[in-house]
A protein has these predicted regions:
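Active-site core of glycosidic bond-cleaving carbohydrate-active enzymes
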Residues: 1-256
Length: 256
């Protein structure tokens, strides 16, 4: 808890006046850009700490930073009530990435808009805990959800399904979860998710009636899986699903 409190204080201190959050905190690199999911740590991390420890002070100390981040998105987007036009990492290292790309094939604007909604909702929740007036964010959140549903009525990748269901953005979240289960099954009970979709994958499957499928993914040892790195002697989390490849080769040093 103490580590993350300190890190979040660094994030707030390094946050730009317009709410921009660099993708490395402390901000030791030059010419950084904000990216959906990365910058959303300004809202996600305080809320997760609050859920873990129940201490309102973490929300109180980060509340202005949380609001500034949502304000940054609102002021920088090219489409009202969505987050479009930015440059993002997308579903980084998703296994459905086009040839020659590190970004998974999920729609980057969909990912960004999903996290816009999520961070706005977290500001609402934090404000309610703190007794703050969050009516502005309640209206914004409703508008984002409506725009999201109009713009993306169907989902084509595992990560798109995951975000639509987990953040309750789809008109029919069960249908989005059903599509996710089909995509996983059709892939040979394999995940294709990257940085964005992976943390929520098993939650969505479990929450929407696919517990057995979630267990099959979790306990899988062949690449790609959570246990595959352990079979190769890993003691930390790799950036790539195959930091050591099946033939024993390593990724280049810029990645691991």
């Amino acid at each position: 808890e103490a580590f993350y409190r300190k890190w979040l204080s660094d994030l707030a201190a390094d946050q730009y006046p317009d709410g921009h959050v660099d993708h490395v905190i402390p901000a030791i690199l030059e010419n950084q850009k904000s990216s959906a999911a990365w910058g959303d740590a300004a809202c996600v991390c305080p809320w997760e700490l609050y859920l873990a420890f129940g201490d309102e002070n973490i929300l109180r100390s980060q509340f202005n930073s949380m609001k500034k981040w949502v304000g940054y998105i609102t002021s920088s987007t090219t489409t009202k009530n969505l987050w479009t036009g930015g440059e993002h990492y997308g579903d980084w290292l998703g296994l459905d990435a086009p040839s020659g790309s590190y970004k998974g094939s999920s729609d980057e604007d969909l990912i960004a808009s999903a996290f816009y909604a999520h961070s706005t909702e977290l500001v609402m929740k934090a404000g309610n805990v703190l007794g703050e007036d969050v009516s502005e964010y309640e209206t914004l959140y409703k508008n984002i959800v409506a725009a999201f549903q109009e713009t993306w009525p169907v989902y084509h990748t595992q990560t798109e399904c995951i975000l639509a269901a987990h953040f309750h953005l789809a008109k029919d979240c069960q249908a989005a979860a059903d599509q996710l289960a089909k995509l996983v099954t059709d892939a040979g009970v394999q995940l294709k998710t990257g940085f964005v979709g992976t943390p929520y994958l098993l939650h969505v499957l479990s929450d929407y009636g696919y517990v057995s499928l979630a267990w099959s993914l979790l306990l899988r040892e062949n690449y790609p899986s959570w246990l595959y790195p352990i079979t190769k002697g890993a003691t930390t989390i790799w950036e790539h699903w195959d930091g050591i490849m099946e033939n024993g080769d390593f990724w280049t040093r810029d990645m691991n």
